[in-house]
Structure formats: structure tokens, C-alpha cells
């Protein structure tokens, strides 16, 4: 698949949730509108879209949100993507990860994890995110 400039399109960004437990100054709306549960695509629906995208030549999938680790069974979804022998990366704030989650992602062969860490200064981190968990993220 090519864009209007004849560049190959080979990746798709999938936002699996619009929710996030951070309140980042640069991201948060003053009047957030969250989708109702029934309005969010199920993993089965997302996988049908993924299968169609693969047929069109997409071979890289970037999983984002909101904060994707908030969504129940996000690890199942990533595992299902990896079964399709495609490249999968995850973007997260890292605050909800456990060692078990990281071990699982390594075991199934995730291709990359992008951690959103805006500063290494504890005070600045809190001012940006309204969360006091930088040390947890860095661990």
C-alpha cells in the first residue's frame, strides 16, 4: 500500500483504549470525553481489522492508548498479534507493568516497548503527570 507520495505504508497504530490514569498537562483535556465500554472495539473486532491490514501489506503494529496496560487482557491481544508473525511495539507510561508482564512480553517476542518518560526529575515528573511513580517506572 502506498500513500499519495508513493511511500510504502507498512505500519498501523492501534489505540486499544482512550483511558489513562495519568493526568499529563500536555495530554489531558479539561473536559475529557471517554467512550462507553460498548463503543470500544473488542479484541476480536480489532483482530479482524489486523487481518485485513496484513492482507494490504501492513506488517508492523504499534499498540497505544490512552494507557494500553489499563485495558484488561492487553497481553492476550499482543500475543494474538505475534501469532500473525508481525512486528509489534507497545507504547506505555510503564507505571502498571509488573516483572511478570515484562517476562511474558519477552517470551512471546514483542519487538519493542516504548516508555514515555518525560523527565528524570521527581518534582517535574509529578508536575507533568500528576503521578508520584517515577521510581516505579524506572525500576
What are these regions (language model features)?
Residues 1-2, 12, 37-38, 65-66, ...:
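A generic structural signal for short
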Residues 3, 7, 123-126:
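Flexible, active-site-adjacent loop/turn segments at secondary-structure boundaries
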Residues 43, 47-63, 70-139:
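Radical SAM/AdoMet-radical enzyme domain recognition
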Amino acid at each position: 500500500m502506498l500513500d499519495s507520495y508513493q511511500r510504502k505504508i507498512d505500519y498501523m497504530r492501534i489505540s486499544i483504549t482512550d483511558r489513562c490514569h495519568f493526568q499529563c498537562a500536555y495530554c489531558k483535556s479539561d473536559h475529557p470525553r471517554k467512550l462507553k465500554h460498548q463503543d470500544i472495539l473488542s479484541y476480536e473486532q480489532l483482530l479482524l481489522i489486523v487481518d485485513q491490514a496484513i492482507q494490504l501489506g501492513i506488517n508492523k503494529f504499534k499498540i497505544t492508548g490512552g494507557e494500553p496496560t489499563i485495558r484488561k487482557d492487553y497481553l492476550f491481544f499482543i500475543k494474538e498479534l505475534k501469532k500473525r508473525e508481525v512486528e509489534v511495539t507497545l507504547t506505555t507510561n510503564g507505571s502498571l507493568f509488573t516483572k511478570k508482564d515484562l517476562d511474558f512480553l519477552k517470551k512471546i517476542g514483542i519487538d519493542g516497548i516504548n516508555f514515555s518518560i518525560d523527565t528524570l526529575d521527581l518534582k517535574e515528573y509529578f508536575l507533568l503527570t500528576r503521578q508520584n511513580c517515577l521510581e516505579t517506572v524506572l525500576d
